C-alpha cells in the first residue's frame, strides 16, 4: 500500500470545522499505534481523564485551558495558539475548550492490561465523587458512554462528603 499524502490542517479545518462542534467535538485523523484527533470547542465536560500514557496537545487555533490535578492541587494550564504541551502519564486532566478553538491531541494506544480512568470531583468541596476504570479501545465512544452513565445515576453524582449533586457538564468555558 502506498504512503498517504500529507494532510493540510488549515484546509482540512476550513472544510470540516462543522465536525468539531458539540456534542462530539472531535474527529480522529489517525488510529493505529496512536490516535491523532482534531478537537474543537466549546465543550462542557466536568470529568477528569486519567491515562497511564502521555498525552500530547498542540493548540492550532485559539486558547484552551487544561484543568489538572498537580500533586494534589487543582490548577489551570493555558495552552495558547501555537503552543504545545506534553501531559505526563497519570495526571487527572479536564481539557476545557472555548468557542471557535481547534487543537490537535495525540494519544498512544493503550498496552494490554493498562486501564484508563474517568473521575468526577465535587464542584463544591473537590472530593472525588465517582471514578470508573476501563480498558480504552475507542476514544470516540467509551468516554461518552461513561459520561452518560454518570449523568443518569443520582447516587454516582452525589458527593459522599458534602451531599452536593454534581453534573457531567460544566458551564462552557470562556477566555
Curated annotation (Swiss-Prot):
What HAMAP family would the database entry show? Answer: 3_HAO
GO terms (BP aspect): 'de novo' NAD biosynthetic process from L-tryptophan; anthranilate metabolic process; L-tryptophan catabolic process; quinolinate biosynthetic process
| Family assignment from sequence similarity | Belongs to the 3-HAO family.
| Protein name stated in the entry | 3-hydroxyanthranilate 3,4-dioxygenase
- Where O2 is bound, by residue? 45
Q: Give its localization.
A: Cytoplasm
Q: Name the Enzyme Commission number(s) assigned to this protein.
A: 1.13.11.6
Q: Which residues bind a divalent metal cation?
A: 122, 125, 159, 162
- Which pathway is this protein assigned to? Cofactor biosynthesis; NAD(+) biosynthesis; quinolinate from L-kynurenine: step 3/3
Q: Which residues cross the membrane?
A: none
This protein's encoding gene:
BNA1
| Primary location group | cytoplasm
Asked if the Swiss-Prot or TrEMBL record annotates the protein with the keyword Cell cycle, the reply is no
Enumerate the residues binding substrate: 55, 97, 107
Q: Which GO terms describe its molecular function?
A: 3-hydroxyanthranilate 3,4-dioxygenase activity; ferrous iron binding
Superkingdom:
Eukaryota
Q: Does the keyword Oxidoreductase apply?
A: yes
Q: Which SUPFAM superfamilies match?
A: RmlC-like cupins (SSF51182)
PANTHER family, per the entry = 3-HYDROXYANTHRANILATE 3,4-DIOXYGENASE (PTHR15497:SF1)
Q: Which GO terms describe its cellular component?
A: cytoplasm
